[in-house]
C-alpha cells in the first residue's frame, strides 16, 4: 500500500513535469512559426494548465473508469478555487485588475451550468462529449479573439503578465527535445497514476468517484498551485486568477468531454447531486470575489476558502458514502 502511494505521488509529479515541458516546447514552436506571443500565452499556456487533468482523464477513460474521470474534473475545479486560491491569498492578498478576466468569468459560469445540464441525467453520452469538446473549441476561438483585442490595446495587466512568463530562449532543437522527452514521460506517468490509484481504491474500498474527487484532483492541480503562489509572490495577480479560470473551463469542457466521447455510460448519481452542486456554488463565490469592489482577495477570504476545502473533504467522509463495499 505504501509503495502504491509513493508511486502514485511520483506519477502525479511526473505528469505535472511532463505537461510543463510540453507547454514549454509548444510555446517555442509557436513563437518560431510567428504566432503572436499573447495568443500563445492565452491558448497554449491555458491548455497546459489543465494538461495533467486531461491526460489522466484520457487514461482513465481508456481503462473504462468513467467515474474516476468525472471525479477528477469536478474535484479539480473545487480544489482550484477553495484550496489553491485560498492558499495563494494566504501567502499574499491580491487584487484582480484585468478587464479580460472579468469578461471570462461569466463564460466560466456558463460552462459550469452547461456541465450541469450534461450531468443531471446520470450518464455521459457521445453526443455530450462532442458538445463539450465543441464548447472547448469555441472557448479557444474566443480567447484568441480577446487576445488580439488586448494586443491592440496593450494596456491590460493580464496580457503584460502573460507576455512576461513566455520563454524567450530556445530554438527548434530545444523544442523537439523537450517534446520528445515529454511524450515519453507522460504515458508512463499516467499509467503509474491510474494503476496505483486503482490499487489504493481497492485497498481502502474507495469509490472511483471519491478517488477522482480527492487524490487525483489534488495531485493534478499541483501546476495550478505552483503557478498561483509564484504569481502572487511576484505580484502577477491576474495570471494567478486567469489560470484558475482557464483551467476550470477546460476541466469541464475537455476533461469531461473526452471520457464521454471514448467511454460513454452511466455515472455515479452523487456526481451531480453532491459534487456538481458544490462545484457550482464555489464557482459563484469565486466570481463574486473577483467582481466585488474593491476586487481584493485578502487573507480573510483565503482562510474561508481553505476552511471550505477542509469542510468539503469532511463532508465527503462523514456525510456521504465515500467508501464502497
Question: Predicted regions span which residues?
Answer:
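Hydrophobic alpha-helical segments, chiefly the membrane-spanning helices
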Residues: 1-325
